[in-house]
Amino acid sequence: MEKKKRELDIVLLLILLASAFLNIYNIWKDDTVNPYYTAAVTSMMQSFHNFFYASFDAAGFITVDKPPVTYQIQTISALIFGMHGWSVILPQALAGVGSVLLMYLLIKPTFGKTAARIASFVMACTPIAVAVARTNNVDALLVFFLLLATWLLFKAIRKGKLIWLLAAFFVVGVGFNTKMLQAYMILPAFLLFYLIAANATIKKKIVSLVSALAVLAAVSLSWPLIVDNIPASKRPYIGSSQTNSVLELAFGYNGIQRLTGQNSGGGQGAPNKDASKEMSSSDNTQAPPNQSSSNSSSSDGKSSNGNMAAPPSNGQMPSGGQGGPPSGGDGGQGGPGGDGGKGGTGTGSKMQSGSGMFGTGTPGPLRLFQQELSDQISWLLPFAIFGIAGLLIAGARERRRLSVEQKETVFWVAWLVPIAGFFSVAEFFHHYYLIMLAPPIAALVGAGWVALVHLYRNQTGWKAWLLPGAIIATTGFELFILRNYNDQIGVGWSIGVGVIGVLSAIALLLFKQRQKPFSYYVSLAALLALLVMPMYWASTPLLYGGNSSLPETGPQLASMSGKGMGMSDATVNEKLIKYLEENNSGAEYLFATTDSNTAAPYIIKTKKAVMAIGGYSGSDPAITLTQFKKLVKEGKVKYFLASGMGRGGNNDIVEWVEKNGKEVASEKWQSSSDQKTENTDSADTSSSKASGENGKMGGPGGMNQSATLYELHADE
């Protein structure tokens, strides 16, 4: 018996290998991924001070907009393997594989090996989960931490040991220091499950939960309270905050604003709804003009996960409200190579072409079924809903007490429903946040399939018909999703999905009395057929290149063909770097500029400090004019690059620079011919082609023709 427990599940191994392939293959072609965060890792490698605070720049002037845990893990990876795009992606890619394994371990003890295999395979094939795992955004690691916490919680229930419960909430606290309040979205499920599943008196349950919540609070607030209690003069400014406070960042910008979409003031934070709509539809918006218009892409001209100057994971508008990223494509006309259309038409970025803020659809109860979001996460959501009914019915016992199967079903439902509800009404989120829904959907599909097959075999009436009903409903919904892509991928896929789904359902309806293996294999074949299109969607970042700043999946990536929304490789102006290094006279900062998008590629390329006076958006009140003048007087800042894209929230500093600085002749530092730059990537939405041909757009790292370099003198 002991030997049997240790047997290797070959099917699981194959699923893990498939997950590893989807998450890892070709990540080595993405040199700097999301430059905003890669710049931070570059800086964090240089000192423990930067490592602790997640400093964006090497001088420790300002932090990124998230807690440090993910970037500390990425920094350790970069220290081990060297600073490469793939080395900062690798932790997230492995976390994605780890999440697939955890799904198996969570489902198998109660629902069996088949359910566990299906759940892990669904998790591996979830399109947005794969897309996020192939970037340096934090969400893949967050989901891994939450699933690890869930495994510890389940162990606490089975073992009846308080230590496992405390460990579970400890890990959720680590999740808070990964992406703040997003980690708390699963707390309702944790609390409810422990109350209904723990074998203890209600008094003991409450005492245990209070203890666990105390651990959660201690771990969650450890880093924020330490940072907030350190004098501001001895630490970096907290990026994307208005009051230089981690707690304000957590509960304001990374908290309530995610739900309301309201601006916190000062031009920073979530754009308002009208600004978002303008960003999504405008043909004239530009990226931060910090790139020579003639610079081209990296040496190989390839990127597996291209980037864009859209908010790295937060939705801020670069350069002080100059709109969002360019509309993409050649010359910025709609989606790459064309008109973009409505969300899900098969061309253009979903953020550009979809309705609602950041192309996430119209808030409402059916938002997850709208074309803007459904192809990223919801393919099997109808099957999961039927699975809930099947699990609650099949798990029922003669006694009125909930069975173990029903209790765990309640847990996954309590994870799914509140988070689905949040995304149904929230104003301020991106497509890749939907990875939070991947675990409960995978669990309910895997366990639900087994329950539905059991009901089909052993029940009569409507309970028996839940299985064919689930197949028909899910088939119909997949055809609804595919209808917008038939012109691009061919109608054959829709026909194939429809035929297999309908024939499977008919076979189950007509031949119910056949022997049991028949129903098992027919229903399994139907489910696998329903997984074909999600798996294709999940593979599109490998096939066509992705978007490292705002990950998404789908055939529309093919139309970008490496030159659309987020597909271009970032470049820096080599002539500018050479000029600054020759003339900087030992200043602490290579140069100062308005925003992090402009600064990031230069930090990555030179490993030197570049001051972004307004943080990511250009509007953080990170430094006053008096403080800036003091730095100039001390010789720490000698050059200022005005991007020509507006002054952000630091008008007084830019005005002072323009009035007192000496303009450097453009021929001394601006390139006039193509210069390929290795080991850099774009965080911009405009392509290098558009940059080169039009002379008007530039990704972060160079400048457009309106950029100006000023020399500042200490005696000013």
Swiss-Prot record:
Record membrane topology: Multi-pass membrane protein
Annotated segments matching region Disordered: 260-363, 664-716
Cellular component annotations (GO), alphabetically ordered: plasma membrane
Biased composition (Low complexity): 290-307, 680-694
Keyword rRNA-binding in record: no
Record field: compositional bias (Polar residues): 278-289
Keywords: Cell membrane, Glycosyltransferase, Membrane, Transferase, Transmembrane, Transmembrane helix
Comp. bias (Gly residues): 318-347
Family: Belongs to the glycosyltransferase 39 family.
Top-rank taxon, per record: Bacteria
Gene Ontology BP annotations: lipopolysaccharide biosynthetic process; response to iron(III) ion
Chief site of localization: membrane
A molecular-function term among this protein's GO annotations: pentosyltransferase activity
Lineage: Bacteria, Bacillati, Bacillota, Bacilli, Bacillales
Keyword Transmembrane helix set for record: yes
Species: Bacillus subtilis (strain 168)
Cellular localisation: Cell membrane
Segments traversing the membrane: 8-28, 44-64, 87-107, 118-135, 137-157, 159-179, 180-200, 206-226, 376-396, 409-429, 433-453, 462-482, 491-511, 518-538
Enzyme class of the recorded protein, top EC level: transferase
Protein name: Putative mannosyltransferase YkcB
E.C. number: 2.4.1.-
